[in-house]
């Protein structure tokens, strides 16, 4: 019954570039061994690791009440609160819990605003009151030192996100991605690395300097969260733990 009565349009058919990217990369596998130098593998400072690793992703072992968060995010989707996110995609939608506003889901530059607004003007948006369990978890478990943009990210059934990079380098990991659900048939694929191993409740620091794309071939929305901001000491310790456990 999701989307019943809503004006959200259904996704367009996947474009040839994204389809070709999936054909070429979906089933690739590649070892992380030797990707980082020995001094990075032995690093005990999480900041140095986060800034210098070349891993495409790092699992972060923290607990996520993903079923409760899914209920809150689904309700907001059903009631038409999400906005379309970025061109060159279809069925990709977003909603800010923390940021410049609930609908400013991209960087300030995309709205003709100064870059510093990301830091200076981010706050709990009006949407935060409608997802109290999500906010509680962010405050009590994730415990970032400072949040900037924190978003629910939805890919509708049949939706896709074109191959792209979010940074101009492959050194260091960027935003945090949390799988609230991850329906069978929906995949994030990285060039040369294949499918990211998302399961409901999994958390990763992602190296978005590698080209990646998403395609939801399931019959249900795929709901994730993306965190931007400054991780606190607890979260950074879990990044280091996840790295060491998989090195």
Indicate residue ranges for each PLM-predicted region.
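A short beta-strand-loop-beta hairpin characteristic of the jelly-roll/cupin
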Residues: 179-199
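Tight coil/turn sites that cap or link beta-strands
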Residues: 157-159, 201, 209
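Non-heme Fe(II)/2-oxoglutarate
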Residues: 1-141
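A short hydrophobic beta-strand segment most commonly corresponding to one strand
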Residues: 174-180, 203-205, 220-237
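A short beta-loop-beta micro-motif enriched in histidine and acidic residues
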Residues: 146-147, 161-175
């Amino acid at each position: 019954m999701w989307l019943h009565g809503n004006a959200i349009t259904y996704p367009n058919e996947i474009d040839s570039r994204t389809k070709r990217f999936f054909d070429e990369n979906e089933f690739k596998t590649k070892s992380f061994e030797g990707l980082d130098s020995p001094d990075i593998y032995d690093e005990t400072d999480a900041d140095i690791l986060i800034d210098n690793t070349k891993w495409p992703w790092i699992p972060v072992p923290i607990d996520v009440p993903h079923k409760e968060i899914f209920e809150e995010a689904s309700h907001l989707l059903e009631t038409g609160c999400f906005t379309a996110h970025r061109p060159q995609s279809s069925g990709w939608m977003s909603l800010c819990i923390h940021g410049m506003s609930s609908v400013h889901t991209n960087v300030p530059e995309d709205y003709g605003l100064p870059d510093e607004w990301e830091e200076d003007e981010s706050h709990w948006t009006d949407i935060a009151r409608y997802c109290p369990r999500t906010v509680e978890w962010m405050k009590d478990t994730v415990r970032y030192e400072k949040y900037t943009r924190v978003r629910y990210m939805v890919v509708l059934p049949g939706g896709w996100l074109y191959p792209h990079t979010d940074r101009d380098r492959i050194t260091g990991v960027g935003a945090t991605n949390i799988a609230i659900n991850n329906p069978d048939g929906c995949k994030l694929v990285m060039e040369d690395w294949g499918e990211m191993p998302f399961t409901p409740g999994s958390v990763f620091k992602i190296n978005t300097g590698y080209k990646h794309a998403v395609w939801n071939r399931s019959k249900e929305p795929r709901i994730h969260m993306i965190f931007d901001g400054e991780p606190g000491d607890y979260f950074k310790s879990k990044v280091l733990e996840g790295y060491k456990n998989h090195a």
